Amino acid sequence: MIWKRHLTLDELNATSDNTMVAHLGIVYTRLGDDVLEAEMPVDTRTHQPFGLLHGGASAALAETLGSMAGFMMTRDGQCVVGTELNATHHRPMSEGKVRGVCQPLHLGRQNQSWEIIVFDEQGRRCCTCRLGTAVLG
C-alpha cells in the first residue's frame, strides 16, 4: 500500500460535506493499494447546456481524485496543491454515472503526477486526465 495517511471511505466521503464535491454528487467508492476511485452522476448538475457531460465536471472529478490521493501521500504538517490539470475528452455522455480511477505516475518529495481515467458505465474511456501537484510543508 502506498498511502501514508490511512482513511476509510466513510472518512474520505465526509471531507466532501458542504463542498463542490458534494454538490456534483461525487462519492469515493474504492481505495486500493495504489488506486482511488469515485463515481459522479451525469445529470443536470454535471451537464453542459446541450445535455451532455460538461468537460469541466470531468475535470472536477479528476482534480478531486488526484488532490485527495495526493493528500493521502503526505505526512502531518504537509499539504498538496494542484499545479496543472490536463484533460482529453474521448466520448460524450448524457446520462448515468461515470467512474474515475486515479493512480500515481510519479511520487516525489516535492511534486506528484496522477493519471485519472474517467469511464462510462460500460467501461469505455470517456476522458483521460493528468494532475500535477506540489507538496508543501
From Swiss-Prot:
The lineage of its organism: Bacteria, Pseudomonadati, Pseudomonadota, Gammaproteobacteria, Enterobacterales. It comes from Shigella sonnei (strain Ss046). Homotetramer. Dimer of dimers. Interacts specifically with the aryl carrier protein (ArCP) domain of EntB. Keywords: Cytoplasm, Hydrolase. This is Proofreading thioesterase EntH. InterPro entries: HotDog_dom_sf (IPR029069), PAAI_dom (IPR003736), Thioesterase_EntH (IPR026576), Thioestr_dom (IPR006683). GO terms for biological process: enterobactin biosynthetic process. It comes from the Bacteria. Gene3D superfamilies: Hotdog Thioesterase. Belongs to the thioesterase PaaI family. Pathway: Siderophore biosynthesis; enterobactin biosynthesis. GO terms for molecular function: 1,4-dihydroxy-2-naphthoyl-CoA thioesterase activity.
